[in-house]
Amino acid sequence: MAIIKPFKGIRPPKELVEKVESRPYDVLDSEEARAEAGDNVQSLYHIIKPEIDFPVGTSEYDPRVYEKAAENFQKFQDNGWLVQDSREHYYIYAQTMQGKTQYGLVVCAHTDDYMKGNIKKHELTRRDKEEDRMKHVRVNNANIEPVFFAYPDNAILNELIMRYAATEPEYDFIAPIDGFRHQFWIIDDDNDMQTITNEFSKMPSLYIADGHHRSAAAALVGAEKQKQNPNHRGDEEYNYFMAVCFQASQLTILDYNRVVKDLNGLSSEEFLAALKKNFEVADKGTDIYKPQQLHEFSLYLDEHWYSLKAKEGTYDNTDPIGVLDVDISSRLILDEILNIGDLRSSKRIDFVGGLRGLGELKRRVDNGEMRAALALYPVTMQQIMDIADSGKIMPPKATWFEPKLRSGLVIHKLS
């Protein structure tokens, strides 16, 4: 069962939300955050990217930077830019991208569920990134930004959400940069909140879509606080962390594509010939060609697009990892032909995800920066859940969720 609870959110007044809200901390660097914040002293970047309050070049891992985050978080509350709700709520957060809307429930999940594996992950985490997020949680005594969860489709929850979605939202704005619509409702009916809690309790698992390091950090800080509290009961706020939970079928996963700097000493003709061992190769001409189905890839090379269809027997339909296109392309193209083994460390490969599209692949090859590009069909949410259920880990650079959650709509304090 998934243990969740409502919480007293800390959030901006309606008239300030567009001043406060921001992109998440991990999708932009310090200079981008500095530019986006500009002279806006109410921007959440002063809390989630507080190095912008120091001279250019200051490390985001400088101890003073973490202290500044806490100082700014307190200032935002003192100035009324962030205000805590007087009672516990669940919230609804909707995102609309290109005419499609996905509705998330903002809840507090239990750290024990993470530790026990009831909150399932599909990515490896790095200790240095965990420690960075742990420092941020510790110093602020809060989850400033939520984790992004998926849950199996649920008709009762969907009906409840749509009932609220037909009412006036608390927040409703078009975000800069992404241009997507973001809406936010407060669930204040006790019966509705009990329904949400009950329906989640029937779910065997929740799935981390995005935010593996934030999840790990929240659980580890919760465990620390348990040890530090001789009167620990188990219902304290530090046992919970903030998540936005979406129905799996509503989520949009975009293609996460590859560009390579060289062909491992092969000519174009030799490379295409090598591909024919495991793929049906078809020249699609000079117009951009997007993969149409699983196990089909698009190759851009020498101003031409090619379709590559993996031959029968090159993958195992019973293996949740081996059947993934990211694994097929890594094994049979990047590793076997191009000798690019470790995608995380190789300098010969880069990744292009999200909304930049295949035009960005073409641009980076045409300008000579890269030698060839490989476009993949997107991973499905069902594939991610199958892998998480099997206890396995997705290959690196496999998933790109869009839209990203905006930060600053609501914050969860740990005490």
Predicted regions and their residues:
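Surface-exposed, charge/polar-rich loops and edge strands
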Residues: 1-415
